[in-house]
């Protein structure tokens, strides 16, 4: 199972939000590049980056920082936040981003997702953020009446293979991920699902890893606040999921 330490960017700094609220942002790193380097030193090979300014403004804000993260860390980076055009996807991929995560456009303009998959293949990942099973968009500010599973199945039809699933109610709360909903979504959709939101203990990762070993299509997990607060180290987390890098 693949582990993605997370860096959320706000005004060029590494922050974490509580349940997606911009007003509840805690700064954990004035220099995101240093945060990424530390992740690399502990054995990471991947990084999950969210441009929070872009998610709320719907336009790129932190590209210079993203480029520095890629160049200085050597990590495989996936980026989400405010990506709503093919041109924007191409810009990020040219920067060296491995995968782009599409959220709002999957709901608003699904035909754009289809074009993106045709053009960029598996570099396109869908991000489904849900609360009480219903999809939220626009940086989580707006809740829809669309069920997470229904959206996942629609995306599968247009060729999407990878999905990041976030239970908003768990994000940044250190209450544990919604494993039941995540596993159910993976089983019923058949997509490769990355679990996001709420990982607080190594046991959370063990439970996800056990499901993956049983054949559930869980590609990995995103870990954020637990790393910043010292709940466990990234090296410990990597050992749990059986992903070791550089002999760590």
From Swiss-Prot:
Catalytic activity: 1-(5-phospho-beta-D-ribosyl)-5-[(5-phospho-beta-D-ribosylamino)methylideneamino]imidazole-4-carboxamide = 5-[(5-phospho-1-deoxy-D-ribulos-1-ylimino)methylamino]-1-(5-phospho-beta-D-ribosyl)imidazole-4-carboxamide
Gene Ontology terms: cellular component: cytoplasm
Location of the protein in the cell: Cytoplasm
GO biological process, one term: L-histidine biosynthetic process
GO molecular function: 1-(5-phosphoribosyl)-5-[(5-phosphoribosylamino)methylideneamino]imidazole-4-carboxamide isomerase activity
Active-site residues (renumbered): 8, 129
Record bears the keyword Nucleotide-binding: no
Family under the similarity heading: Belongs to the HisA/HisF family.
Protein name: 1-(5-phosphoribosyl)-5-[(5-phosphoribosylamino)methylideneamino] imidazole-4-carboxamide isomerase
């Amino acid at each position: 199972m693949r582990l993605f330490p997370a860096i959320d960017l706000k005004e060029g700094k590494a922050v974490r939000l509580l349940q997606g609220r911009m007003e509840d942002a805690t700064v954990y790193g004035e220099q995101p590049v240093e945060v990424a380097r530390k992740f690399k030193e502990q054995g990471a090979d991947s990084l999950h980056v969210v441009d929070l300014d872009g998610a709320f403004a719907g336009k790129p804000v932190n590209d210079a920082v993203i480029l520095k993260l890629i160049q200085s860390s050597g990590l495989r980076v996936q980026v989400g936040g405010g990506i709503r055009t093919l041109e924007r996807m191409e810009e990020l991929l040219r920067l060296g981003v491995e995968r782009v995560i599409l959220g709002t456009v999957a709901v608003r303009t699904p035909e754009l997702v289809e074009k993106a998959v045709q053009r960029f293949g598996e570099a396109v990942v869908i991000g489904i953020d849900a609360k009480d099973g219903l999809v939220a968009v626009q940086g989580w500010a707006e809740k829809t009446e669309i069920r997470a599973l229904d959206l996942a199945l629609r995306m599968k039809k247009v060729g999407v293979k990878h999905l990041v699933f976030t239970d908003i109610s768990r994000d940044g709360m250190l209450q544990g991920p919604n494993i039941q909903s995540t596993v159910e979504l993976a089983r019923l959709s058949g997509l490769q699902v990355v679990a996001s939101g709420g990982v607080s203990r190594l046991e959370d990762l063990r439970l996800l890893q056990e499901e993956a070993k049983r054949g559930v299509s869980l590609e990995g997990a995103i870990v954020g606040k637990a790393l910043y607060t010292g709940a466990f180290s990234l090296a410990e987390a990597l050992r749990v999921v059986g992903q070791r890098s550089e002999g760590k």
